[in-house]
Amino acid sequence: LELDPPGPYPRVPGFWIDVTTEGARSRDPRKFHKDAALLQAALQREPGNARYQFYLAQSWRDAGEWAQARAAYRQRAAMGGWEEEVWYSRFEAARMDELLGEPAAQVIDAYLAAHDQRPQRAEPLVALASYLRGQQRWASARVFAERAAQLPLATDQLFVDAAAHGWRARDEWALACYYTGDRALAGRLW
């Protein structure tokens, strides 16, 4: 099923999905590897299917196969299509760079590329601030965390991380303020 143009996808207040892990599939430690194998086979039949490509990347990520996930996310981003999914693929590829321990310049550039594509999303800025904090680059972390904290909650439909738009951005900003000597602002932010 495809909807062209995509959306709108209104939120329905009061409804949620209750996820449990009681079934046989949920207990299978190789479930995401099996999903990836099925999706790879499907992509052999339909190589241009962006949905298959996206879920292949998600499956590799959830299986802990970060290098394969990164390659699949990059491929999905290159396919174009739904802007939010392309952006999310680019953002996840940046996360995979970080998890794989790639050089700092590559990780930073990947997060900035994700930010440049959808500057209304706080997630890449918060992830970048957290990464820089881990490198003890407090002043740089402060710049990105402060900007993330100023962004309103994104109105996108795909995987909006409300915590990144809220407390996580403020927490990263406060930590960076503390370590750059602005303890008064850090205290107010916390």
Spell out what each predicted region is.
Residues 1-68:
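Catalytic-site signature of metal-activated, phosphate-bearing donor transferases
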Residues 32, 66, 103-104, 138, ...:
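TPR-repeat structural position
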Residues 63, 100-101, 135, 180:
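Structural motif corresponding to the intra-repeat A-B loop/turn of tetratricopeptide repeats
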Residues 55, 92, 127-130, 134, ...:
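"A position-specific structural signal for the A-helix of alpha-solenoid helical repeats
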Residues 51, 84-88, 123, 163, ...:
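Start-of-helix register in tetratricopeptide repeats
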